[in-house]
Amino acid sequence: MNPQRKKRLLLIVGLLVGVGVAVGFALSALQQNINLFYTPTQIANGEAPLDTRIRAGGMVEKGSVQRSSDSLDVRFVVTDFNKSVPITYRGILPDLFREGQGIVALGKVNADGVVVADEVLAKHDEKYMPPEVSKALKESGQAATGGEAKP
């Protein structure tokens, strides 16, 4: 093999290795940023992975919101009218958060089956419902109406 071909071969191999490393980094970054949606039934059945960031959504059960008197800790229960899952959150809840409303919480499921949320999103008007929550409610046989849901 002459020196010109050897140089060209090393250049091509180097480029292929570089592209492979770049694709590997891109796939790794994308995989870490995927937050799959799980219903309370799926979480209660153990289908949601533990200690992996997920989105959990449903309707906030009436009478389930418990606020700590000395911190920003909040505990509430979310349901899809089949099963319910407790969610804990430390922070200020959105102004539109209330019992009987649809929410989506981003966080991790711990070993006790509790979603430890680091972000809570509430629907922003009486007609809007997160698509995942609406679909989950339809699958459970409940009407996905605005305002309060009736079990």
Swiss-Prot record:
Residues 1-8 are cytoplasmic. It comes from Pseudomonas putida (strain GB-1). Belongs to the CcmE/CycJ family. Pfam families: CcmE. GO terms for molecular function: heme binding; metal ion binding. Its main location: membrane. It is found in: Cell inner membrane. Residues 132-151 are annotated as: Disordered. Residues 30-151 are periplasmic. Gene3D superfamilies: Nucleic acid-binding proteins. GO terms for biological process: cytochrome complex assembly. It is a single-pass type II membrane protein. The chain crosses the membrane at residues 9-29. Heme binds at residues 124, 128. Keywords: Cell inner membrane, Cell membrane, Cytochrome c-type biogenesis, Heme, Iron, Membrane, Metal-binding, Signal-anchor, Transmembrane, Transmembrane helix. Heme chaperone required for the biogenesis of c-type cytochromes. Transiently binds heme delivered by CcmC and transfers the heme to apo-cytochromes in a process facilitated by CcmF and CcmH. This is Cytochrome c-type biogenesis protein CcmE. InterPro entries: CcmE, CcmE-like_sf, NA-bd_OB-fold. One of its GO terms (cellular component) is plasma membrane.
